[in-house]
């Protein structure tokens, strides 16, 4: 079983995902069951983290720290300009809110280090948690709208119904995007990142591949595509 755990950690699965995946792949095999806490214990406590030393993929663990650190679930409140006009999340169709119908997306930008001009645009489909990632050299409103158009335009209409986004000025050209794609944009309330929680969670997973402070001008499109591929192969507990 240890080899199975190590193999999954090297695929960048979290300990929780490793535990769930083993149960799914080896039904009825009690010898292949291991709890999330047991994996964490082996990584950080038992034998001074001996299991961690067996990982062969650089940064296979989501955090480089040598111990577990509790995470605050309270949203950070930053100072930023807001878009005064536009459809609010309260106007979004009920089918998007309950994830019953595919085609409703959440999106955001991940701003890189360095000159901070290069960024990643991330999109997550709310029903399937399917991820799209694209690298963008500049992130003015028109450039963001045009890249989003390129990302969405290749999708069938039935899986491109709406997009939920923060009220930041980077989406000031949302009408340009909607006219080009037919996809309506709905804006979260100020300081409410949990209203696009699937995207927030996915951005955290993307940081496994590109840690905070990464200069995205040094990242290739091939690397971005590989991160997208691995994320879409990753088992999701919410889909079980």
What are these regions (language model features)?
Residues 224-226, 234, 238-240:
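Low-complexity acidic/polar repeat-biased segments
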Residues 216-221:
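Conserved, non-catalytic sequence blocks in retroelement Pol enzymes and Pol-derived host proteins
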Residues 1-198, 205-215, 229, 236:
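Secondary-structure boundary/capping micro-motif
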């Amino acid at each position: 079983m240890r080899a199975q755990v190590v193999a999954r950690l090297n695929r960048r699965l979290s300990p929780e995902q490793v535990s769930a995946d083993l149960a799914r792949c080896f039904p009825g095999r009690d010898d292949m069951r291991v709890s999330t806490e047991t994996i964490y214990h082996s990584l950080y406590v038992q034998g001074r983290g001996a299991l961690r030393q067996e990982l062969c993929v650089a940064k296979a663990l989501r955090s480089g720290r040598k111990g577990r650190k509790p995470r605050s679930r309270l949203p950070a409140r930053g100072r930023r300009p807001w878009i005064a006009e536009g459809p609010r999340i309260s106007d979004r169709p009920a089918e998007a809110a309950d994830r019953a119908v595919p085609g409703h997306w959440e999106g955001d930008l991940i701003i890189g280090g360095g000159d901070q001009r290069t960024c990643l645009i991330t999109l997550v489909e709310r029903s399937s948690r399917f991820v799209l990632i694209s690298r963008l050299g500049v992130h003015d409103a028109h450039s963001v709208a045009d890249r989003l158009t390129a990302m969405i335009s290749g999708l069938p209409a039935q899986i491109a119904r709406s997009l939920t986004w923060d009220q930041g000025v980077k989406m000031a050209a949302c009408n340009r995007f909607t006219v080009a794609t037919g996809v309506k944009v709905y804006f979260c309330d100020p300081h409410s990142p949990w209203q696009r929680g699937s995207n927030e969670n996915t951005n955290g997973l993307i940081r496994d591949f590109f840690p905070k402070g990464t200069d995205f001008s040094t990242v290739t499109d091939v690397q971005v595509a590989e991160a997208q591929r691995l994320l879409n192969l990753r088992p999701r507990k919410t889909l079980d």
